[in-house]
Amino acid sequence: REWDWYGARLVIEHCDRFIPEQKPEKGFLSIEEEIQIAAEFEVGVLINWGRSVLEERSADAAYDHIIAAGKRGVLDGVVFSGAGPEETQYGYSWVDGHLPGQSDEPASLMSDAEIKRCAQAAIEGGCNYLGAKMCVPKDASLEERLAMLTHVYKACDLK
């Protein structure tokens, strides 16, 4: 069956997989299953940094997921959205709360070094786009909001 998507590309956004020992945020498929499906149906995979991290409770998870999708040729994009082990103004520990980077939210595991490492791995893995999605304090000015996004952009260290 052929579909005309008028240039749009279907992408699977990875969310945390179901792990019986922990309360899921989404509880969907594993990255390995999503990569297999994406390869089979010729669609891309988007890695949401925070969702990979909260799944494994480790900043290394996002990097590992980026590498895995890149090796299979299905890595389409990476969105930087933080996560962390502590309760913050954005929610409980390990919430899919789109925490800002560590420079703006110390409890976030999304440090400048992790952003750079993952951005570089994504580019090397054939990624088509990088993005950022984060919550901001409700009273943040426009300048503060833009500064938070700029911190992520600069941490990518794009050349």
Report each predicted region and the residues it spans.
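Short beta-strands and strand-loop turn motifs
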Residues: 12-14, 46-49
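A residue-identity detector for tryptophan
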Residues: 3-5, 49, 94
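Active-site glycine- and acidic-residue-rich loops that bind
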Residues: 1, 18-31, 51-65, 139-140
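Active-site acidic/histidine proton-transfer and metal-coordination neighborhood
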Residues: 1-41, 145-151
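Histidine-acidic metal/acid-base catalytic patches
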Residues: 39-47, 54-159
